[in-house]
Amino acid sequence: MKPSLLCRPLSCFLMLLPWPLATLTSTTLWQCPPGEEPDLNPGQGTLCRPCPPGTFSAAWGSSPCQPHARCSLQRRLEAQVGTATQDTLCGDCWPGWFGPWGVPRVPCQPCSWAPLGIHGCDEWGRRARRGVEVAAGASSGGETRQPGNGTRAGGPEETAAQYAVIAIVPVFCLMGLLGILVCNLLKRKGYHCTAHKEVGPGPGGGGSGINPAYRTEDVNEDTIGVLVRLITEKKENAAALEELLKEYHSKQLVQTSHRPVSKLPPAPPNVPHICPHRHHLHTVQGLASLSGPCCSRCSQKKWPEVLLSPEAVAATTSAPSFLPNPTRVPKAGAKAGRQGEITILSVGRFRVARIPEQRTGSMVSEVKTITEAGPSAGDLPDSPQPGLPAEQQALLGSGGSHTKWLKPPAENKTEENRYVVRLSESNLVI
């Protein structure tokens, strides 16, 4: 029994002896050098592995690698980029921030909070920059740095500039609204308000820049010119007159397409010069004198060409004569004038007529014409120049004869002629 009892403690001692040796051996194998950390998967045959990017291990040990310090969180610049064996070293504060000198672990504060005399905040005028650019250096692992964002405190100069902008913008807005209001008021009174200079047509490609409808009245302006100018001063009347002229032009094109156009033969030297246009009346009584290379109406350029009515053109081409025939039957479908009126010009619904003076006698006065220094009515040729308007045929009579309007011999008073302008159903008597 005794030998067995002695063997038991000995055997236990021999069994427990290898455990401390084994423990020491395993403990020394798990110590990793700087820049490495223990491998948690020892099945690959390695006990330590390198530190991942963005981490470091500065001494021997079994602890895992630690991440690098982030200087952006402390509002500091990176003085030295971290490696696998060394942490990132932070330097001075960002521009516009202040902090304890030589203590890189303490976060920096904005200069707007700093008292007077703090180093680094005097040159910035105690203002912090918005969106400060960070000197972000790419680390060995390629970690990106995010710039910080700070608050901004305005100084006296910046505040004054903001107040100036706030005061100027409403002033310009009010000036624009005032200009629009004044322009609308002028338009209601009949003025022409434009934002640019109007260039009128001229022989040299330029003009005076004034609308012809708004020019001052000329002393030598004829009666029809005054009437047309007064009518075209209103936009509604001008638009209606344009429609009438378009309708008249369309009728003229239809009529001239079915008959040949007769040309004006050269006139003899003793005949007075006639306007080459031959498409409008210069005065109520007939053709007017010339002023320069063209007629007075064309030189003034205050209205488009006023053409003869379709009835007058048809009467001229069908039966040309020197004197108007008062007994001629009006054309079917044409608008007849009122009793006692003599039509001077008719364009669509626009009609200019002459009203003789109505005497108190029982009979209406008649307009008589006589021919002076010329052949008798029986000797007049039938059609000396076919295709000419009536007023030009009266001027181009043979032998220099001319007609004259006479009053009845019973009356010695001056006859007053009144003219009426009819547009649709409304009349304007002058």
UniProtKB/Swiss-Prot annotation:
Alphabetized InterPro entries for the sequence: TNF_rcpt_RELT, TNFR/NGFR_Cys_rich_reg, TNFR_19-like, TNFRSF19L_N
Intracellular or extracellular location(s): Cell membrane; Cytoplasm; Cytoplasm, Perinuclear region
Gene this protein is translated from: RELT
Bias (Low complexity) ranges: 134-143
Species annotation: Macaca fascicularis (Crab-eating macaque)
Chief site of localization: membrane
Chain residue ranges for the region called Disordered: 134-156, 373-411
Protein name (database record): Tumor necrosis factor receptor superfamily member 19L
Cellular-component GO terms for this entry: perinuclear region of cytoplasm; plasma membrane
GO biological process: amelogenesis; apoptotic process
Assembly: Interacts with RELL1, RELL2, OXSR1, PLSCR1 and STK39.
Classification of source organism: Eukaryota, Metazoa, Chordata, Craniata, Vertebrata
Post-translational modification, as annotated: Phosphorylated in vitro by OXSR1. Phosphorylated by STK39.
